[in-house]
């Protein structure tokens, strides 16, 4: 392969992607907000931009003289499909749509789309306050699950039963959300 591959994010989970891209013959451009992110040592070029800021990322990319030689944009083990789609679209590269990326990275938007499309999904609501969480539990009972709308994996996800401290649940989930939004759903 020839050309450049842009990898959004450079955490430890992404080292394999950087190494594999290099083995495939790509020149790797890595981006991360942290200039000391572990995977950046495997990149040929480093750009400092938050993985969650699509505009800052594309501005950093376009600062490269030969940014048009980028052949693809990927991420691995990083919940930033919107940034990947945004950058790919700006560079005229194939990718999922911005709408699909937005739906896949925001659990509340995804659940609302499921509901609007008559896809069977558990009862859910956005909890903007601790009182919203209390109200949901009063209405729907236990068990339930609380999670950040924008988290990945199981970060910030809490199973709620009658022994749970709801104030702690709310603050814990919120602390794992970049958007400061959480969702509660019946389990």
Regions found by a protein language model. Give the residues of each.
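ATP-binding N-terminal substructure of ATP-dependent carboxylate-amine bond-forming enzymes
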Residues: 1-100, 131
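Fold-independent oxyanion-binding glycine-rich loops
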Residues: 10-11, 31-34, 148-149, 162, ...
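Short amphipathic alpha-helical segments and helix-helix/interface helices
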Residues: 18-19, 111, 134, 170
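Short beta->alpha linker loops
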Residues: 52, 79, 105, 125-131, ...
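CheY-like receiver
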Residues: 60-64, 135-136, 169-172
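A conserved helix-loop-beta module that forms one wall/lid of the active-site cleft
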Residues: 89-156
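Conserved ATP-binding module of the ATP-grasp superfamily
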Residues: 120-122, 139, 143-146, 158-187
